[in-house]
């Protein structure tokens, strides 16, 4: 069973949309970035949810496109001394936690995540302290400070196994921050879980009613859903999983049409894997002016070519990630606990969001 905390009604201030670049401007920035990557001994590492041109640039320059944990692990083993992380801030922190000796740059440190914003370390710590008999399990989409308070850090592809393990030991669990993913895991495992009430602004907008109507238009299509979506949406899915798992499902499922309920940035990599299939954006609760994220993270959209070039060119406090060493060491403990658990299960850990 699970115990639901009171919903935290937070309206997140979205950043302004980036100003579109002309084609000649794009080509000039791409050329500059390629040169700067060489000069700075840097590699570009991008998340699946960044814009397609950023993912393409990462791949064409020998960098990497993946989920948050894959990004951090790639940066850890890649020989470059500077990592430029195109994603949101907790991803840069994760890279610094795993690879403290390298310089970690981001196009902007203002690229937030609603899951991170909705789980402030002081309030979360206060809640955890009020339930000292609970094991604290947090999603990777959290700050270094929240990770440091946790007993376990998990990604969406291994969360079920870890919660099942803890439940088998009779341990009640505090789960944070995503309420939808937490409810999905609680339903699957039957574990005793207290759920922090955060949400991803992108996945929270997907609508079951609208999805049913779309399915009626495409009756032969498979529905792929990220578990950060509401339960009513997850119930309609043919496949539920993390970003990496959804890409794999698109390839393994026999259907030639896929309705995809996650950030539309995933379409770049997914279409690479299944060029012969038709990918369809799942509908959000609103359309046009009435949707907020409109199936694309507004903070991911801040990782533009101009910002990447500026980060490489200038560096400095407005671009570089720093994590207090004591906090880094403490947050590494629950992260390593997950990695060790995955290794024991002989699982390849792939992550979140």
UniProtKB/Swiss-Prot annotation:
Binds 1 [4Fe-4S] cluster per subunit. Its EC number is 2.5.1.72. GO terms for molecular function: 4 iron, 4 sulfur cluster binding; metal ion binding; quinolinate synthetase A activity. It is an enzyme of class 2 (transferase). InterPro entries: NadA (IPR003473), NadA_sf (IPR036094), Quinolinate_synth_A_type1 (IPR023513). HAMAP family: NadA_type1 (MF_00567). This is Quinolinate synthase. It comes from Vibrio cholerae serotype O1 (strain ATCC 39315 / El Tor Inaba N16961). The gene is nadA.
């Amino acid at each position: 069973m699970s115990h639901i905390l009171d919903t935290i009604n937070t309206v997140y201030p979205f950043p302004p949309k980036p100003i579109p670049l002309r084609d000649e401007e794009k080509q000039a920035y791409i050329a500059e970035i390629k040169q700067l990557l060489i000069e700075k001994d840097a590699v570009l590492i991008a998340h699946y949810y960044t814009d397609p041109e950023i993912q393409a640039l990462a791949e064409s320059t020998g960098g990497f496109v993946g989920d948050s944990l894959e990004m951090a692990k790639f940066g850890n083993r890649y020989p470059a001394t500077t990592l430029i992380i195109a994603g949101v801030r907790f991803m840069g922190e994760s890279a610094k936690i795993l690879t403290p000796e390298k310089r970690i740059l981001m196009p902007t440190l203002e690229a937030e995540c609603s899951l991170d914003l909705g789980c402030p370390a002081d309030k979360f710590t206060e809640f955890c302290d009020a339930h000292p008999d609970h094991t604290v399990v947090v999603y990777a989409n959290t700050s270094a400070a929240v990770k440091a308070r946790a007993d376990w850090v998990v990604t969406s592809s291994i969360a079920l196994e870890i919660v099942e393990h803890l439940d088998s030991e009779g341990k009640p669990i505090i789960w944070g921050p995503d309420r939808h993913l937490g409810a999905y895991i609680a339903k699957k495992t039957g574990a005793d879980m207290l759920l922090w009430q955060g949400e991803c602004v992108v996945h929270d907008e997907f609508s079951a009613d609208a999805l049913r109507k779309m399915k009626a238009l495409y009756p032969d299509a498979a529905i792929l859903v990220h578990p950060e979506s509401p339960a009513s949406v997850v119930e309609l899915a043919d496949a539920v999983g993390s970003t990496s798992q959804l890409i794999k499902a698109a390839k393994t499922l026999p259907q030639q049409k896929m309705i995809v309920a996650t950030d539309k940035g995933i379409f770049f990599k997914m279409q690479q894997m299944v060029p012969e299939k038709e990918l369809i954006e799942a509908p959000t609760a609103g359309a046009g002016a009435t949707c907020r994220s409109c199936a694309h993270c507004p903070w991911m959209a801040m990782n533009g070519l101009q910002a990447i070039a500026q980060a490489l060119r200038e560096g400095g406090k407005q671009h570089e990630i720093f994590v207090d060493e004591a906090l880094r060491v403490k947050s590494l403990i629950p992260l390593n606990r997950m990695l060790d658990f995955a290794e024991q299960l002989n699982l390849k850990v792939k992550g979140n969001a």
